[in-house]
């Protein structure tokens, strides 16, 4: 089963770009900033597991 999640958005409403695919410390930090524990780089954007629709950008 796929784990639900979302692409977090920055304060300008943009996704977080990343270059190192898969496990990515930068994305991990971004996801923690958004209140979830785990995420990784997918299709050059940070993806956070279990992140709700991200309306409250940080």
UniProtKB/Swiss-Prot annotation:
Gene Ontology CC annotations of this record: extracellular region
Compartment(s) of residence: Secreted
Gene3D superfamilies reported for this sequence: Knottin, scorpion toxin-like
A matching Pfam family: Toxin_3
Keyword annotations from UniProtKB, A to Z: Disulfide bond, Ion channel impairing toxin, Neurotoxin, Secreted, Toxin, Voltage-gated sodium channel impairing toxin
Single GO molecular function: sodium channel inhibitor activity
Record carries keyword Lyase: no
Annotated LCN-type CS-alpha/beta domain residues: 3-58
Membership in a protein family: Belongs to the long (3 C-C) scorpion toxin superfamily. Sodium channel inhibitor family. Beta subfamily.
Chain's role: Beta toxins bind voltage-independently at site-4 of sodium channels (Nav) and shift the voltage of activation toward more negative potentials thereby affecting sodium channel activation and promoting spontaneous and repetitive firing. Moderately toxic, but very high abundant. Does not target reptilian channels. Does not produce effect when administered to blowfly and cabbage looper larvae. In mice, produces convulsions, tremors, increased ventilation and, subsequently, death.
Annotated protein name in UniProt: Birtoxin
Taxon lineage: Eukaryota, Metazoa, Ecdysozoa, Arthropoda, Chelicerata
């Amino acid at each position: 089963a796929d784990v639900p999640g979302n692409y977090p958005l920055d304060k300008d409403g943009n996704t977080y770009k990343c270059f190192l695919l898969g496990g990515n410390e930068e994305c991990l930090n971004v996801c923690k900033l958004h209140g979830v524990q785990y995420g990784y780089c997918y299709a050059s954007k940070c993806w956070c597991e279990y992140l709700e629709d991200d309306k409250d950008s940080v």
